[in-house]
Structures are given as structure tokens and as C-alpha cells.
């Protein structure tokens, strides 16, 4: 798709930057309409790659190319990759009980598994205070959270489960012949292979990072996660590890290890919802039955979702990676994707 003269002048004005597309090699995309949709809803960036090649970049509302912005819960996926890397390296087993590493967990917490921490079905209270700055030991705070649901039965989205996972990984790695911190392990096994450096970790006084949020990435940097999703885990994980990572749970088949999927879109009775709106409800009022990100778009779509509609979409069947960064302004995943894909 070749940019129109008007659009070209728009580029020169510095409001939008776009790259021409060879229509014979790329899917038919409504790039102009999608960029307008993003810009009109307080979007800062729309960045699209096809087969690893950038086919569209646009920046609006004062944003500039190359700026790193908060991806909020998009951070979770990187730690999910680190968890599966630790499984591959023999440090963790998903079915292993957390209490095998954290013996102080007893009673109802005794049988919680590492996998239940990573798919947010462990039953722990959400622990939203763990997002705060200036904490002494957020890992201990997470370990002390009470059980509010039977492990394995309910999806409870919040930072506490991931902080417990961090404590497990921290103790596992500390026991090795050459001990390293989880942060250094993340950098070596996940970030460096993706061409990324150290990130914004928001450590507490004990040095524990916040796993639920914190990273700041440019569209180009974040798109490397999308490249990995299209490549079924390369260069970080084996394909079979990716299958486990994206499996979902009985409590919420659309989520696992920091990633959201659209598989239900191809099923009878699928429910397209605004995931951020659903997460705003108390956990026991949320309904994750048959939910999908967007109807009418490929069901193999995978998403990393951050607050205020920070989005990474990867669509393997179309070889597409799509990044949207901006503010919350009546943005709809379904409307945006249908606008772009037609």
C-alpha cells in the first residue's frame, strides 16, 4: 500500500510517520483507518511489522519515534518467559508445590503449585498494595496474603501471585553452584536474546523487583516480544515450552503466564469483552467463560495487555505484530483490530 500525497504531506508535518508496503507481499490492511482510530483515541504510537519488516509506523498526540513508554502489565509476559526458561533449564517444575521451596507455607497454601502462581489461579488475595513504591519487602507481603479462593478454582489477577513466584525462583537460583538473582537470570535468558538490556524493575528495599509492571519500551523494542510469539518461542524457548506457556487454565482459558489468547473467538457462544473493564471488577464478580479479545479476527491472535490500552498483538497466521501505545480513551480491541484487518 503506497501512502497518498495527502498522507505524505502529513508525514512531513511530523504528525505521523509511515512506511510504504508492498501489497503483493503483505495482507490487505486498512493502515490509514487504523492509524486514525489510534490517533483519535489519544494514541501515541501504532507500529506494525509483517514477517519481521516494519510496514507502518505512526506517532501522534505529541509522541515521537523511539520514545520508551510504560507497558504496565505487558511486563508480566517477560517474567512468564523466564519461568518457562527456568523449566527448560531444570530449575523449576510447573507441577511442583510451592511449599517444597517455601516451607513456611502451610495449611491451605501447602498444595499450591508453581503453575497456579503463573496462571493466577493460586487463590491468593490480589495484593494491589504491592504496586506501591517505597516497600520494604514486597515478596514477604505477597507470601503473607491470605487465601480467598480454593487453589485452582478461580482466576485472581494481581501482583501477589507473581511476587511469590519471584521468591520461589530467587531461592532456587540462590541454591545453585553459581547463584544469580532472578533479574540477572531474566536478562541473560530472555532480554539479551531479544536484543534488550536491563529494564525498569522498581525494586523494593530488599532489591525485589515488581513483576506485575514496570518496564518501559519503545514500540520497536516491545515488538521483539511479538517476533518471539510468531517464531513459537525462538530465540528464548522451545516450541513445546510455548505450547505449555499459552495453554490457559480451567478458570480462565484466555490467560496464562502473562499472555492473553483469542481461541474462544472461533467457538459458538464466544463473548467479546473489554478485558480491562472486566479486571476492574472484584475478582469474584468477574466472568471469564468463553471470553475472547475480538470476534471476526484470527483466533490464533496472542496479546500482551497493559493498562490504558497498551497493546501488543501477534497474529501468527498473518505474520503480523501490532503495537499500540497511548492513553485510555474509549479504545476497543475488537473495533481497532476489525478496522485494521477489514
Residue ranges and their predicted role:
Residues 88-122, 174-213, 217, 233-234:
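Active-site helix/loop module of the DD-peptidase/beta-lactamase fold
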Residues 34-64, 312-315, 319-323:
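A short, well-structured edge-of-sheet supersecondary motif
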Residues 1-16:
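N-terminal secretory signal peptides and thylakoid transit peptides that target proteins
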Residues 19-35, 41:
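C-terminal segment of N-terminal export signals and the immediately downstream linker at the start
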Residues 52, 68-95, 117, 165-170, ...:
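Active-site SXXK
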